Structure formats: C-alpha cells, structure tokens
Amino acid sequence: MSACQSPIIVALDFPTREAALALADQLDPKLCRVKVGKELFTSCAAGIVETLRGKGFEVFLDLKFHDIPNTTAMAVKAAAEMGVWMVNVHCSGGLRMMAACRETLEAFSGPRPLLIGVTVLTSMEREDLAGIGLDIEPQEQVLRLAALAQKAGMDGLVCSAQEAPALKAAHPGLQLVTPGIRPAGSAQDDQRRILTPRQALDAGSDYLVIGRPISQAADPAKALAAIVAELG
C-alpha cells in the first residue's frame, strides 16, 4: 500500500476497467489516491478495487450509500472488507443510518476506512433544492447535515470548498473532502461551486477530488505533478 501524503484524489470516472487502469498506470500512488464511483464499480464490481490496491493505490469508494440503517451499515462493512481507504454515505439518510454505519465499522476487525458523509451535491444550487422541497440555501443545508454527521460520529464530510470555512469552524474534527476542484483555466463542466486546488486547501479542505483536469489531460502524470507542485 502507498504511503501517500498528497491531498489529491483522482476520480477514475470511466465506463470500463481498461480505461480506468490505463489512467491509473500513468499515476504515482505516492502522489495521489484514486476514487471509484458508481459507473466504474457497476461495470467492474469489487475486482477493480482489488486491482487498484494491488498497484499501490488507496481507494475512495464513492458509492454514496443511502438506505435503511441496517442495509447501509452492511454495505459499508462490505466496503471495509474490500480494503478501501474511504467510503461514503448520504447524510440525508439520517442520524440512525449514519450511526449504524459507524458502529459497524467500530466492530470491524481489520483496518477501518474513513466514513464520510455526503451533504449537498456540488451540482445543486438553491433552485435545485427548492425543486425537492427544501426552501434553503445550499450552505445552510450543508450545515444542518454536518451537525447530524458530527453527532453520528462520522470521520468527515464531502462538501464544496466554499462551505469548508464554516464547516471547519463548526466541526474542526471533521475531515473535508472536496470535489469540483479545477486548476486555474479549466472548464467548470457540470459542477457549480468550484475553487482551484490551492484555494480549496486554504479554505479548509483536507482532500481534493480532481477528475477531468487530470484524466483528460494530454499527459495525466504531468498534470498531476503540476498540481502537486502548485500545492507545495
């Protein structure tokens, strides 16, 4: 397993095992961790996690579990048995669901992955929340869900970098994982609440999820190295 000290998590957002491994083979596991999301995991199942771990990568399993407490807790346990470094669940599943996941991991005999809560997806703005019956600013909803996550004993949160300062102030013990990271000059794509890597760390983020600026670069290894150098 790598001794990765970098905050960078590269999103392996690909439909096939071959495409994901083609990128992973260009990356140094000492400079980044990798994220396996719904598309890749559904296509490849648990074998992709085993293969990536065999290449030295710590794996963030980004499946955003959301179900009744026992079902979600058993899914988190299955992720731990795969040897993932980090796993996440939706905070909107509620206090009992998150607490059940934490309790299950506390009883797990092997290395325990970080248990991270998903607050408000970075693609969602106020009008999107209104469409699902929440007449509230995204940042206020994030703070409400963060309080639940803290009470449940979660290790951290997925949040946008704009929300990081308020979250660090309110819950300094929670580790913050931030998607929607774009180096200066990159396209925003479908994520709205974005900052550059340096801005995100300065705002209080602990881990940075970066996808297309690395995966679609002409030279992914060079793109990763440039971001690492920017962060010092």
Curated annotation (Swiss-Prot):
It comes from the Bacteria. One of its GO terms (molecular function) is orotidine-5'-phosphate decarboxylase activity. It holds the Pfam family OMPdecase. GO terms for biological process: 'de novo' pyrimidine nucleobase biosynthetic process; 'de novo' UMP biosynthetic process. GO terms for cellular component: cytosol. Gene3D superfamilies: Aldolase class I. The active site is at residue 64. SMART domains: OMPdecase. InterPro entries: Aldolase_TIM (IPR013785), OMPdecase (IPR014732), OMPdecase_AS (IPR018089), OMPdecase_bac (IPR047596), OMPdeCOase_dom (IPR001754), RibuloseP-bd_barrel (IPR011060). Substrate binds at residues 13, 35, 62-71, 122, 182, 191, 211-212. Disulfide bonds: none annotated. The keyword Transcription regulation does not apply. Catalyzes the decarboxylation of orotidine 5'-monophosphate (OMP) to uridine 5'-monophosphate (UMP). Belongs to the OMP decarboxylase family. Type 1 subfamily. This is Orotidine 5'-phosphate decarboxylase. It comes from Pseudomonas aeruginosa (strain ATCC 15692 / DSM 22644 / CIP 104116 / JCM 14847 / LMG 12228 / 1C / PRS 101 / PAO1). The gene is pyrF.
